[in-house]
């Protein structure tokens, strides 16, 4: 039997850091239960986008309102993932506020 191993990078993005950490923890626990070696979660710097808007529609330039969006990011690396680990991760249910990008690299034959 030929076992194909792949390197998988899972990038998580969310506006809520609590939701993001909970999702990362569930991915890591699922991967470890399946027998994978896990690197991470690797924390990326928080991105803050600030928007400054005039409160008034016409005059009063001094009266402004500030809004910001904070984007949190985490990276989880699975150096040697096989098909059982991938199936376990596919069946995982994550919250709606978390954006997940999966990058699969390689496919070397061991065995």
Curated annotation (Swiss-Prot):
Keyword field contains Transit peptide: no
One CC-aspect GO term: ribosome
Molecular functions per Gene Ontology: structural constituent of ribosome; tRNA binding
Keyword Ribosomal protein on entry: yes
InterPro entries in UniProt: Ribosomal_uS10, Ribosomal_uS10_dom, Ribosomal_uS10_dom_sf
Domain of life (superkingdom): Bacteria
GO biological process, one term: translation
Pfam families: Ribosomal_S10
Keywords: Ribonucleoprotein, Ribosomal protein
HAMAP family for this protein: Ribosomal_uS10
PANTHER family named among the record's database cross-references: 30S RIBOSOMAL PROTEIN S10 FAMILY MEMBER
Function: Involved in the binding of tRNA to the ribosomes.
Assembly and binders: Part of the 30S ribosomal subunit.
Family: Belongs to the universal ribosomal protein uS10 family.
Protein name: Small ribosomal subunit protein uS10
Lineage, top ranks: Bacteria, Pseudomonadati, Pseudomonadota, Alphaproteobacteria, Rickettsiales
Gene: rpsJ
């Amino acid at each position: 039997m030929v076992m194909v191993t792949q390197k998988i990078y899972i990038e998580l993005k969310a506006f809520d850091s609590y939701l993001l950490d909970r999702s990362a923890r569930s991915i890591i626990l699922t991967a470890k239960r399946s027998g994978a070696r896990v690197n991470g979660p690797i924390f990326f710097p928080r991105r803050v986008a600030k928007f400054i808007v005039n409160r008034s529609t016409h005059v009063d330039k001094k009266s402004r309102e500030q809004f910001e969006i904070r984007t949190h990011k985490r990276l989880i690396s699975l150096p040697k993932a096989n098909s059982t680990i991938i199936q376990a991760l596919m069946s995982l249910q994550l919250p709606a506020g978390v954006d997940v990008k999966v990058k699969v690299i390689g496919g070397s034959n061991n065995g």
